Structure formats: structure tokens, C-alpha cells
Amino acid sequence: MTSEVEQPTAMSEALGYEQARDELIEVVRRLEAGGTTLEESLALWERGEELAEVCRRRLDGARARLDAALAEEADPEDGASGADGGGA
């Protein structure tokens, strides 16, 4: 019972960013609305933490892909595709 929230479950990892974000929004709404038992609130909070981690990982992955693409564009030796308007 020490690291239940640290790693998202395989089912959570299968979610796309938008799905995880939408479910997280719903979890927050339910927590803010109240009316749940302590156990239900704790379960919702744990699920929210898991979903937030999925979102963080998806965003980190997207950021890494963008950084890699921008690095390729910035490397003039890598992108020699004749876009400089070369010759007559």
C-alpha cells in the first residue's frame, strides 16, 4: 500500500491525453460538488492523481517530440532539401 498512486495502471496508460484530461475534469467536479463518503472521496482523489500523471507523461512526450522536430529544423546540415532556392 506504499506506492499505489506512483505509477498509473496499464488501463490509465492506454488513455489518450484528451480522455485522461476529460476524466480528470469530471473527478475534480465530483470532488468539488461534495456529497461523497470519505472512502469515495479518497478513491476519486487517487484516480485524479493517476490521471494527472498520465496527462503529465503525455505532455512530456509531446514536448520531447516538438523539441526533436525543432532541433532537426535548426540543423542546416540535416535539412538540405533544396529549399534555399538554388540555381539557374
Curated annotation (Swiss-Prot):
Region annotation Disordered: where it falls in the sequence: 69-88
Keyword line: Cytoplasm, Exonuclease, Hydrolase, Nuclease
Protein localization: Cytoplasm
Catalytic activity: Exonucleolytic cleavage in either 5'- to 3'- or 3'- to 5'-direction to yield nucleoside 5'-phosphates
GO molecular function, one term: exodeoxyribonuclease VII activity
Enzyme class, first EC level, given as a word: hydrolase
One biological process term in Gene Ontology: DNA catabolic process
InterPro entries reported for this sequence: Exonuc_VII_S (IPR003761), Exonuc_VII_ssu_sf (IPR037004)
Listed Pfam families: Exonuc_VII_S
GO annotation, cellular component aspect: cytosol; exodeoxyribonuclease VII complex
Subunit structure: Heterooligomer composed of large and small subunits.
Physiological role: Bidirectionally degrades single-stranded DNA into large acid-insoluble oligonucleotides, which are then degraded further into small acid-soluble oligonucleotides.
Family: Belongs to the XseB family.
Protein name: Exodeoxyribonuclease 7 small subunit
Species assigned in the record: Streptomyces coelicolor (strain ATCC BAA-471 / A3(2) / M145)
Origin organism lineage: Bacteria, Bacillati, Actinomycetota, Actinomycetes, Kitasatosporales
Gene this protein is translated from: xseB
